[in-house]
Amino acid sequence: MKTAFKALVVGAIVGALGSACAPTQQAGGAGSASGEPDLSGSIVIDGSSTVFPISEAVAEEFQKLYPNVRVTVGISGTGGGFKKFLNKETDISDASRPIKPSEQELADKNGITYVELPVAFDGLSVLVNPQNDWVDHLTVDELKKIWEPGSTVKRWSDVRPNWPNEEIKLYGPGHDSGTFDYFTEAINGEEGAARSDFMASEDDNVLVTGIAGDKYALGFFGFAYYEENKDKLKLVPIDGGSGPIAPSAQTIMDGTYAPLSRPIFIYVRSDVMARPEIKEFIRFYMTEAKNLVREVGYVPLSDELYELALKRFEEGVTGSIFAGGGSQIGVRLEDLLKAES
């Protein structure tokens, strides 16, 4: 797939939502905690390890309000999550990239429609071991040189001659990961195109442990997992053409951390949207996400974008705002949502 024009481990959930926020809905919301104390049922969520902390945090707080609703949140990667979702094994799918054309074809074949809802922004973070004292930044071209298919880079000195003549140990998400898809699209110019000789895992904690335990390691994953483990890792600023920039809440939100800033999503199957527990859960998700997203280390959308996303759900607007085209680099979520509304 050609790149489009160029343009978060659950943290401790603060208990402030308890008596302060429940059960009264905030002004302008859709009434997620509006009263239905006898609401019951079950909701099954699976997919992205990146989105998992957000959905898990939302599920925990929702179940405090509605203890008779059982919400389970699993991890199988964005691609693995879509496989379950499109076979009707789950109600909601966590995704760290938009749905791919091949997945859209399966949805069409199985007669499945869905509503796509952005929930936060993330910045793919490039990490090294804290003992690494030679890397102060990497360029996009250097990342491509390291990660592209058929890469001949084996040692740090293959990237820059003055760097150590030591083997680079690479760590990254597996092929079912939306983070892997987005990174390869942004850096290598083709989704899924990468060298194969790296330690791959759908569990970001495995990647954290690997990089933290190896002086010569290099890897990437979502910003929240760096925030959760910043005492064990060293963040690498990336030069996308405007000088080295590190991911932060500000640079991710304003897009200056390019090309590795992205929106992340949940997908809801249309055929389950009428269930009362699903309706209330999604309304709660969209109205409370801003606070919970921050608590688990990601960057919230603006109030306007959460309102537009909730409107999308309430009106049952199906399909992807990315037209089923998968990862698209440099496309502004705000522009797409506003154009649709």
Predicted features by range, described:
Residues 1-9:
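Bacterial N-terminal signal peptides that target proteins for export
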Residues 17-20:
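C-terminal motif of bacterial Sec signal peptides marking the signal peptidase cleavage site
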